Amino acid sequence: MDKASLGIGIFDSGVGGVTVLKELINLLPGENFYYLGDTAHVPYGSKSKEELLILGDAIIRFFLKLGVKMVVFACNTSSAITLPILKERYPVLMEGMLEPLRKNMPAKAKVGVLATEATVKSGLYQKKLMETNKFQEVYMIACPQYVPLIEKGIVSGKEVEEATREYFEPLLKEEVRDVVLGCTHYPFLTETIQKLYPKIQVIDPAAYVAREVYRKLKENKLLGENGGKVQFYVTGDEKSLKNLGSLYLGYNIDRVQKIDLEVIV
């Protein structure tokens, strides 16, 4: 089988990775995608490195059974913590959220990063961004309320606004004007963030990731031409993927297959 005709696996703990999937579909219309929302284990942000590795390993093996030419970690937590380890274990192209941002984001004096607790605790996101010498200060803000709210379908209203004010308070004190959405769930909240803080520039790394995926596929002569299909999988509840995912992609996700990763964390 021609390797270029194989699909691309993309995963997240839930519906968040759909924000990356949309950019990939727009830039790579000739590709087939397999999207996995690991909803049985959401949120990833409160999990240990060991738990994330067990899940990541099982997900890569699932994609390899399907037959893929590349796996996209559409999850900042997994990108920072497990991708560096898993790419040494498996002979398949991999791309995450952090490196494309690091390479492509323009220089800023100060930048804030909204992220999960696990991403913030790892210290890797801040370290990688500071290594570029593009930023004088990188402020990491853990946002534990965001993912559970989004997975329930709550992307606006009082709860979201209260959480957003709490998370932005330290950034405003430091006069930060550029804020990275360091979790793929967070673009669902862009409207609320911009309503509350219209002078803040919100940076979504998804477009950087899509461009990097395109570059790697082209470099390896793996660009597909006859695709255009997306298959959706979940490990638990499918509601958020069907509802919010459909809204974000602009079409109905009517078929979602439930799978068992056969792991205990």
UniProtKB/Swiss-Prot annotation:
InterPro entries: Asp/Glu/hydantoin_racemase (IPR015942), Asp/Glu_race (IPR001920), Asp/Glu_racemase_AS_2 (IPR033134), Glu_race (IPR004391). SUPFAM superfamilies: Aspartate/glutamate racemase (SSF53681). The active site is at C75 (proton donor/acceptor), C183 (proton donor/acceptor). Its EC number is 5.1.1.3. It catalyses: L-glutamate = D-glutamate. The keyword Cell wall biogenesis/degradation applies. The keyword Protease does not apply. Pathway: Cell wall biogenesis; peptidoglycan biosynthesis. This is Glutamate racemase.
